[in-house]
Structures are given as C-alpha cells and as structure tokens.
Curated annotation (Swiss-Prot):
GO process annotations (BP): regulation of translation
Organism: Rotavirus A (strain RVA/Human/United Kingdom/ST3/1975/G4P2A[6]) (RV-A)
Designated name of the protein: Non-structural protein 3
Keyword tags: Coiled coil, Host cytoplasm, Host-virus interaction, RNA-binding, Translation regulation
One GO MF term: RNA binding
Amino acid sequence: MLKMESTQQMVSSIINTSFEAAVVAATSTLELMGIQYDYNEVFTRVKSKFDYVMDDSGVKNNLLGKAITIAQALNGKFGSAIRNRNWMSDSKTVAKLDEDVNKLRMTLSSKGIDQKMRVLNACFSVKRIPGKSSSIIKCTRLMKDKIERGEVEVDDSYVDEKMEIDTIDWKSRYDQLEKRFESLKQRVNEKYNTWVQKAKKVNENMYSLQNVISQQQNQIADLQQYCNKLEADLQGKFSSLVSSVEWYLRSMELPDDVKTDIEQQLNSIDLINPINAIDDIESLIRNLIQDYDRTFLMLKGLLKQCNYEYAYE
C-alpha cells in the first residue's frame, strides 16, 4: 500500500526541482545578457518570490491536495475522487486545466493581486441601479457553495462598529486655504521683485558694457586712422627718399652700368609696405658698404704695388 506521505514528498520534490530550474534559468539569462550578478542574492530573491507566488496563488496547496487525493484513491478511498466528479473528464483535460489555472494564479500573484482580492472578486459582483447612486452586491455561485459548505463566517466586530460622521468646518478650511494662498502669493511676489531687480542690474551692466565697448571701438578707430596717416607719411617719405637719391645719383660721375645697378636697387624698394621698404633700404645700404669695402681694398692693393703709404686724416 502506498503511503500518503510518499505522494506528498514526490510533489514537494517536483516543486523544489521547479525552484532550482527557475534559479538556473535566471542565472543563465543574466549570463547571456552579460550582466554580472551575485548567485546568493539571485537565489534569495528568486526563492522569496517563488515561495510567495506558490503559496499565495494556492498552486502548492492545490498540488499537495491532488497528491493526497491520488494517494487515497490508490489506497481504496475514492471519496475525494467522487467529490470531484463534476469537473473530471479525463486525465489530459484535467492536467491542461490545472496547468492553465495554476499559471493564471501565479501570474496574478506576481502582479500584486493577492489571494484575498481574487477570492472576493470570485465571490461577489456589483450591479449598478440605473438612475441611482446606490448599487446591489450580488453573490456568485462560488459564494453560495461556500455558504452551503460552511466556509463563511460572520465577524461581529464589523457589525458592532459605529460609523463616525466627521463634521467638516468649511469656514476653517477656507481660512486655511486663504492663508496658504496669501503666503504663496507673497512668495511669488518676492521672487518676482527679486527677479525684476536682477533684470535691472543685468540691464545696467549690459548698458555699461556697451558703453565700454563703444569707447574702445572709438579708440580703435582713432588708432587705425593714426596708423593709416603714419603709413601714408612713411610712404611719402620713402618715395621722396628714392627720388632724391636717384637725382643725386644722376649728378655723380659714375659709370652708366653702376648707375643702372643702383637705380634698379632703388626701384625694387617696396614703397607700399613701410616694413618691407626698411628691409629693402637696409639691403641697399649693405650692398653700397660692401662695394665701398671692395673699392678700398683694390685701392689699398694698388698703393702697395706702387710703394705708397696711406693715412686717414
């Protein structure tokens, strides 16, 4: 004869195996997603949720109850099986219905719809009366069956409680709201006035900055005008210098090729850009000094060949 405890132990083993499978599925999913996890934390969280859902949904008790029914049937006690003849058809249909019901119960439990809410919704329904604010509470067939089976109790503590009617002092409420409104209005006005003062200060700073910028722009314009005038004066001076040197060069008794060479150097001076003009004049002066140095060395050599001596006075 099969003991009832053996059947219940088999069901408990199946439930524990389902829990282990849930833990493995959770950790495997986290690993596939590349998420780091603490195994002990995952185990604790899954166990807490699993135990709550299995207990609150009634799935655990349902499976254990069916195990007891099966054990009693195997031991020759068919009372439980006979009581369930109204919903039994065949093992496949019953298994499918049980699976769907258990799945629904666990889904509702995981969404926060606990056993109390599910039982009350299954036992009662509300019917609205058209044109009235009241309604009729209707008992379902499940409630009727529970009454017949003696599964309904009356809690007198709720009946004896007296309903307290609160008297609302609307004037006091209005005064409180008015004070809150005035306080809020004052804070808004203070913030607005502060904002206005800040805006005025910002405008003053902006106008002051604009005046400074305007003054600096005027100074820059004056400096630009002075630089333009100075550049024009330098261009005129360099042009006069070149003309004066050319005139003086033509009055010298130098060979024509020497005059031509010097004139070419004078004409190469950049009269538009004063900086370049200074560089060109420096180059011209260096060339003249170099030519003078070469001429002096030639004269010195000739004097030595002629046995003459020279001296500066």
